[in-house]
Amino acid sequence: MTKHTESRHKITLSLAFATPFYPMKNEIQLALAQSYGYEAYRTVVKNQFLAGKVTGHEQSEAFLHYTELNEARMNRLDKTTQLTAETLSALAQLDKKYLWLVLTEGWCADGAQVLPVLNKMAQANPNIDFKLAFRDENDGLMQRVLTHGAKAMPKLLVIDPENHILLGQWGPRPQGAVNLIANYKKEHGIVDETAKADLQLWYFRDRGVEIQQEIVALMHQVLSTSLQNLE
């Protein structure tokens, strides 16, 4: 087993044990009712910013600054993000329709790095319907998909579009980025601006590859579980 294959195998296992399968149809339906397509989401965030506001319940100069940075990052990533051959091959195998619903906010730094990649992946297969909803407007759903007790975002939910059952989830960031922040916090005791800069550099160097690998692993697990349920 190569190092690359071993890494992907570990990701698949971790997602298999982490994925919940309990129903939350009401919360999902409410979120979908006020969700946006990718371009519409970006327009809402931009218009809010131009009006001197940010999405979410909390307004601050810091969040305005982060929103402005995110706009520039997402504009760049929308143009430069490329899917690997492995990702395209895996996505082509999805012959059933899926809903990808992401809970996020316009000022979320990880969201700016993750959303363009997810959008490219969804564009690669018409069976994937990609939607985004604001976290703070959908607290009921967010409370059902916490990460270690926190409302971490972005949070991707893979949903069956016919019955609105949650099939899997991912987020808020790829494991390499998780490890970077965890190690920095262990050494320095806090997550400061240096840590945030290091995180953005990690994303830049990775070029969305690890995000793709983890989402492919997630969808593989979703597909495998669906096939097992048919047996």
Give residue ranges: language-model regions:
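Cationic, low-complexity basic patches in intrinsically disordered or flexible, solvent-exposed regions
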Residues: 4
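Non-globular targeting/processing and membrane-anchoring segments
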Residues: 11, 17-98, 143-149, 166-231
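Thiol-based oxidoreductase modules, predominantly thioredoxin-like and allied folds used
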Residues: 101-105, 127-141
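Mid-length scaffold segments of soluble, non-membrane domains
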Residues: 105-111
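Typically the conserved alpha-helix immediately C-terminal to a functionally engaged Cys/Sec
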Residues: 112-122
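Positively charged, polar, low-complexity stretches
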Residues: 130, 142-158
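A short, hydrophobic beta-strand/beta-hairpin element that forms part of a small beta-sheet core
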Residues: 154-169
